[in-house]
Regions:
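Non-transmembrane, aqueous-exposed alpha-helical and coiled segments at domain scale
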Residues: 1-378
């Protein structure tokens, strides 16, 4: 057995065999089941991409229609979950509420303890539909608004915007969010996905695995960077400051600029390429170009001065802001997308399971160290 010691953070360590996602960080390549993310962003939908992630192949037209039908039929929440959302304290963040509600969903799943492949797929349909419903419903409840029932004639992205705002979204808004969901749907063995696989490997249930993933995504070193980007942009706008000068001041004060650099990519994050274009076009269409223009000025400066590239979080901030989405919903929307990838990994893990149990390199006091009686301790 190998006794190789990994570096801190397991950087560069291969910890699983997976056929779901491939990344070439040097070349800036991201693919789902071998298909380049650029092709999916240009040609696919979130539903089709999710089907690809779960099954390993692109669906036929009939298979896609069936997949879409199953996902829309899963748009249902037990009234007790809605009561739970209603009872959440005002201090609770949407991410905390989503995590808690998803854990509670297991109470009302008759097959919670069934970890067969078919049961896991069924639960994945339910969770994918329910994530979006929970976020939209909670946002309306906390604002004192009526809950908007799902519209089964709308696709996943459009239905979320409909339930969130109570207004049928434009084709531009729908397609923008649809592409954003595709881009965020999967990213190999990131912290939340690894957490989900570790939990699933113990033969715990799917709800526990994705609840653990949500807990990991809630951490600011994983999810939430786009929230930091947008708070910075709002502050620049509030002060009427020049974006580049503002960022120079942050750097002089040794403050981190959110949305730049990536643990895996050594060149531009391929997801940022699409989000940049979307942010620009959406801003033009909405007559609100300032968020993109501020972001672009900052990106050009950071790239030239610090040799850092924008990551997926940087332009998702201005994209969501132009869609009128509140900042504290950005990470929950990440989860609405990433449940597709989490589910794929849980299914893959349980289809060929082995408990994940690494070792730790001991760096404590030498063995054997003596036990010192209380009266002899200094």
């Amino acid at each position: 057995m190998s006794t190789a010691v990994a570096g801190k953070g397991l950087e560069g360590v291969v910890a699983a065999h997976s056929g779901i996602c491939w990344i070439d960080g040097e070349a800036g390549v991201l693919s789902y089941r071998g298909i380049d993310i650029h092709e999916l962003a240009l040609n696919s939908t979130f539903e089709e991409t999710t089907s690809l992630l779960w099954t390993g192949i692109l669906p036929s037209e009939l298979e896609l229609r069936e997949f879409e039908s199953q996902l829309t039929l899963a748009r249902s929440l037990d009234v007790r979950i809605i009561d739970l959302l209603r009872s959440a304290p005002a201090s609770a963040s949407p991410m905390e509420v989503l995590r808690t509600a998803v854990s509670a969903l297991s109470f009302y799943d008759a097959d919670e303890k069934d970890s067969s492949h078919d049961a896991n797929v069924r639960k994945s349909f339910n969770l994918t539909a329910q994530f979006a419903m929970i976020v939209a419903i909670y946002d309306r409840l906390r604002k004192g608004l009526e809950v908007v029932p799902p519209d089964r004639s709308l696709n996943h992205a459009a239905n979320f915007l409909w339930m969130l705002n109570g207004v049928k979204p434009s084709e531009t808004a729908t397609r923008t969010l649809d592409i954003a969901l595709i881009l965020h749907a999967e990213h190999e063995l990131n912290a939340s996905t690894f957490a989900a696989r570790v939990i699933a490997a113990t033969l715990s249930d799917v709800h526990s695995a994705v609840t653990g993933a949500l807990g990991a995504l809630k951490g600011p070193l994983h999810g939430g960077a786009n929230e930091g980007v947008m708070r910075m942009l709002y502050e620049i706008d509030r002060e009427g400051a020049d974006p580049v000068e503002y960022v120079k001041g942050m750097l002089a004060a040794r403050q981190k600029i959110s949305g730049f650099g990536h643990r895996v990519y050594k060149t531009e994050d391929p997801r940022a390429t699409h989000l940049r274009k979307m942010s620009e076009q959406l801003g033009k269409d909405a007559g609100q170009p300032k968020w993109f223009e501020m972001s672009r000025a900052i990106e050009l400066y950071i790239n030239a001065d610090k040799k850092l590239n924008a990551n997926v979080d940087f332009y998702s901030a201005s994209t969501y802001a132009t869609l009128g989405i509140d900042i504290d919903l950005y990470t929950p929307i990440f989860a609405i997308s990433r449940i597709a990838g989490w589910a794929a990994h849980v299914i893959e893990q349980l289809d060929d399971n082995r408990l994940i149990r690494p070792r730790a390199e001991y760096i404590g006091p030498p063995y054997p160290s003596p036990y010192i009686p209380m009266d002899k301790r200094g």
